[in-house]
């Protein structure tokens, strides 16, 4: 009587392992980019939260809070899990005939890796900076001091060439 052998041969198993290895070689870098992009998006969220503070400061003719501000003031920065956003710049208050797409002189500098202590940040964006320049209409555009790789900059603020 003949006995039937069941199962996979060594060659078949090696082919499956090779296919999984090839798929992983493409998937892991793409996943790392996805994580870095999602962490970089937090910076724009922090900057959006600072818009109200900037508007309050502009009432006093300055982008940043006065050093002698009262105890109830929030300050010129906001910290998230992965980033620190800080208001800066000089308000262009004497400019006349400004259009909504003109810059008002205020900036928000987002430094990645300076967020909440213990938060693990992607090495692709750690210590990178995204500078945002505020427009007269309150929205942001990418500033010149940005060191963050272009693929991680949120599309809403990406500079057009």
Swiss-Prot record:
Q: Does the keyword Membrane apply?
A: yes
UniProt-recorded name of the protein: Fimbrial protein
* Membrane topology, from the record: Single-pass membrane protein
GO BP: cell adhesion; type IV pilus-dependent motility
Q: Any idea which residues bear N-methylphenylalanine here? A: 8
- Gene name linked to the record: fimA
The principal localisation class reads: other
Question: In its keyword annotation, does this UniProt entry include Transmembrane?
Answer: yes
Keywords per UniProt: Fimbrium, Membrane, Methylation, Transmembrane, Transmembrane helix
Under PROSITE patterns, the record lists: PROKAR_NTER_METHYL (PS00409)
Highest taxon of source: Bacteria
